[in-house]
Amino acid sequence: MVLQNDIDLLHPPPELEKRKHKLKRLVQSPNSFFMDVKCQGCFNITTVFSHSQTVVVCGNCQTVLCQPTGGKARLQEGCSFRKK
C-alpha cells in the first residue's frame, strides 16, 4: 500500500528541509550567514551579518544599509546583496 504522503527520508525535498529546525535537518546547517551589501549611493561594499542586531551604516556616506528586526536584518530599499 502506497500513500500519497510518503516521502523519501534519505532524499527529502529542499523546500521541506529549509523549513525544519536547524538541528533537525538531515545535514545540520545554520540559518545565518554573512553577506556583502552594496550601498545604493556610493556603491561601497560592506560585509554584514544576516541576523545583525544593530543598525549597519555605510563607511563612506553614512547611509543606513540594514535595520534589525526580531530575526533577520531588513535591508533598505535599493541595496543589493550576495551571500558569502
UniProtKB/Swiss-Prot annotation:
Spans through the membrane: none
Residue stretches in coiled coil: none
GO annotation, biological process: translation
Record note on cofactor: Binds 1 zinc ion per subunit.
Keywords assigned: Metal-binding, Ribonucleoprotein, Ribosomal protein, Zinc, Zinc-finger
Pfam families in alphabetical order: Ribosomal_S27e (PF01667)
Cross-referenced SUPFAM superfamilies: Zn-binding ribosomal proteins
Cofactors (names): Zn(2+)
Superkingdom to which the source organism belongs: Eukaryota
A GO CC term assigned to this protein in UniProt: cytosolic ribosome
GO terms, molecular function: mRNA binding; structural constituent of ribosome; zinc ion binding
Zn finger intervals (C4-type): 39-61
Upregulating conditions: Down-regulated by UV-C treatment.
Similarity comment: Belongs to the eukaryotic ribosomal protein eS27 family.
Full protein name: Small ribosomal subunit protein eS27w
